[in-house]
Each structure stands twice: as structure tokens, then as C-alpha cells.
């Protein structure tokens, strides 16, 4: 292709056409996060940079955003496209455990205590026996991959969810009914990713503007004098 077509072919790499990782990826994860929590966050902060891809792009190649809800719960979005070790996935983490939707698995937070022998080895490796009693550890570390988790539906998912998306689309066409709250979900996914991008650009904490709130979940629209 002609070099003159570069910006049109790779439009996702330029702020003129795209907001980069926030609009191309984060919007989907943010929608899932607010759906899972049944809440919309109140503020966002973060940082973005171009640290690896020096190919002329002007959108960030790595971003990190923290969305904060009114009760202190946080939803984070991190993307580093120069490393694919962890892939693309969501993790819903709470005091009782963790859910990984892509894998269809959940992991209980409470696990069986370490066997006495493992505890002894751990104490020895950390030289607890040479320390004062109050300085020793009272637990044995457990790496994440030792907790195998359980499948949410009792067995490994048979697909990656693509077929479910197609089935939902076909059902909407046949019944001529939109999925519930699809407009509200789409609106807030768009607003959250754009607000996150603005926070990255301005390097400051931004609150969700009252004038853009609609009647959905924990948000209420603000009635202006003209609208009353």
C-alpha cells in the first residue's frame, strides 16, 4: 500500500481516529466490570505512555487506569501490548474468592492449611528457628497456580462465548427485541473509556460529570431548569 494510506490503514494507532487502548479494549472490560458490580464508578485516575513501539504511533502502547466507586471498591484496567504473558482476561476479586469469566472458573479465597512438613520447610527456608518467636511467620506461602479453582458450571466451557453472541443477535432479530439495557450499557462503556482516556491525557483524577449521568444503576440524571 502507498505510504500515504498509513494513517487510514492503521487508524487505531493515531489519536485523530482512535483513543487507543482505552476505546479499542478497555471499553469492553469496563462494561463487564460495571455489569458485575451493578454500579458505575465515580472517578478515574491513571497513566499512559509509549515505551516500546517507536513506529510513529501517537496512542499509548501501555496504560493503567483505576476507577473508584462510591464505596471505595476499585476497578482497574491495565494493558501492556509489548507483553502477552497474561493474555486478555478479566478477574473479579472479592473477599470470598476470584472469578475468571474467560476460563469459566472461580477460586475460593480460603484454602486448606499447609501440611506440617511444608510449614516446617518454609520455616527453615526463612530461618525462623534462628529468630525470636514473635519475628517468625505463622503461614506458608502458596503460589497462585497451586489453587486450581473450580468450573462455574461444573465443567469446562465448550466455547469461548462467540456462539452465545451470535445466538443473542439472531434472537434479537427474530423477536425484534433488544437485549435488556443494551443502550445504557453501551453508553456507560463509552463514557467510562473516554473519561479514562481524558484522565491519562491530563494526568489527573477526573470525576464522572453530573451532566452526563443518566438514570441507570447508582446514577441519577440531573434535571436542569430547562428540562423541568
Q: What would you call each of these model-derived segments?
A:
Residues 2-10, 138-145, 162-170:
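Active-site-adjacent bridging/hinge elements
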Residues 16-23, 49-53, 78-80, 150-159, ...:
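Active-site rim elements
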Residues 39-47, 74-78, 99-102, 178-182, ...:
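Acidic/polar loop patches that form or flank catalytic/metal-binding clefts of enzymes
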Residues 1-57, 87-91, 203-205:
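Predominantly a Rossmann-like dinucleotide-binding segment in NAD(P)-dependent oxidoreductases
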Residues 55-57, 71-161:
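NAD(P)-dinucleotide binding in Rossmann-like oxidoreductases
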Residues 55, 154-157, 163-164, 168-228:
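C-terminal helix-rich "cap/oligomerization" subdomain common to oxidoreductases
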